[in-house]
Amino acid sequence: MARAIWKGAISFGLVHIPVALVSATTSNSVDFDWLDKRSMDPVGYKRINKVTGKEVTKENIVKGVLHEKDRYVVLSEEEIRSAHPKSTQTIDIFAFVDSQQIPLQNIDTPYFLTPDKRGEKVYALLRETLVDTQKVALANVVLHTREHLAAVMPLESALVMVILRWPADVRELDALELTEAVTDARLTKSERDMARRLVKDMSADWQPDQYHDTFQEKIMQLVQTKAGEGKIEDVETDPGEEERKSADVIDLTDLLRRSLAGKSSASKTRKPAAKDKVADKQSPKPKRPAVRKKTGKAS
């Protein structure tokens, strides 16, 4: 089963349904990494000052909102955090509407809702009620410190929550400035009949197994072919990147090592001084680490 990305409850009236949120989509797109063609080293990203062209360190970057042309209002991290909505771990239903009333352009990201063992019956009750009434539930939910408008709807035996775009983020059709040739088209009966006949001839069932991303398939086939021919470039990863990825483990190991060292030194101080001197004479001097010779890369 897919990993839950959020746990909480659906809430409407006095009803609470414990649920977990599972992503209903996955990305299979080709991931192209940037490489320096001269050395096949990975190419990263830098924060560049657009005026001076120089790199800017993270501690010198602040966040600003454009207020007027070339004029910004700067907000601190504390001010930004204070604007985040309080996470309630609930999907708060505030209305039930006909699904046809939700414009297609408002639909954004779907998620599956899986019930907790304690709430399976009431989960099924909400699903069946939505089916019987042909309604969807509108709700507010906070995910990753952001408040979202959402629609909860039935899908076969499950419930789905679809994140909706805020109406202010969706453009009206008036922005297209359609002419009367489109809005009040004068179509003849024969034109309509031929179009309907064409649609009828091309009508088919939804067959998801037959719909493929041909670009993805061709790229991966090309990768497999070139790999089979031995056309593979060795890329040296940045050791600093690996250190950052394992930072938590390194920090924990360092803490444990220092804790053990602290205990060891404390126990040594309790031993007689004479024994300490004998131990110092018997222990060999630490060897200096060997210096590695650097080999230049061919450009």
Swiss-Prot record:
Keyword DNA repair: yes
Ku domain mapped to chain residues: 10-188
Residue spans crossing the bilayer: none
Keywords: DNA damage, DNA recombination, DNA repair, DNA-binding
Pfam families: Ku
Biological process per Gene Ontology, one example term: DNA recombination
Residue ranges, compositional bias (Basic and acidic residues): 273-283
Stretch list, region Disordered: 227-249, 261-299
One GO molecular-function entry: double-stranded DNA binding
Record's compositionally biased regions (Basic residues): 284-299
Assembly notes: Homodimer. Interacts with LigD.
NCBIfam families: Ku_bact
Protein function: With LigD forms a non-homologous end joining (NHEJ) DNA repair enzyme, which repairs dsDNA breaks with reduced fidelity. Binds linear dsDNA with 5'- and 3'- overhangs but not closed circular dsDNA nor ssDNA. Recruits and stimulates the ligase activity of LigD.
Family membership noted in the UniProt record: Belongs to the prokaryotic Ku family.
Protein name (database record): Non-homologous end joining protein Ku
Organism from which the protein derives: Pseudomonas syringae pv. tomato (strain ATCC BAA-871 / DC3000)
Organism taxonomic ancestry: Bacteria, Pseudomonadati, Pseudomonadota, Gammaproteobacteria, Pseudomonadales
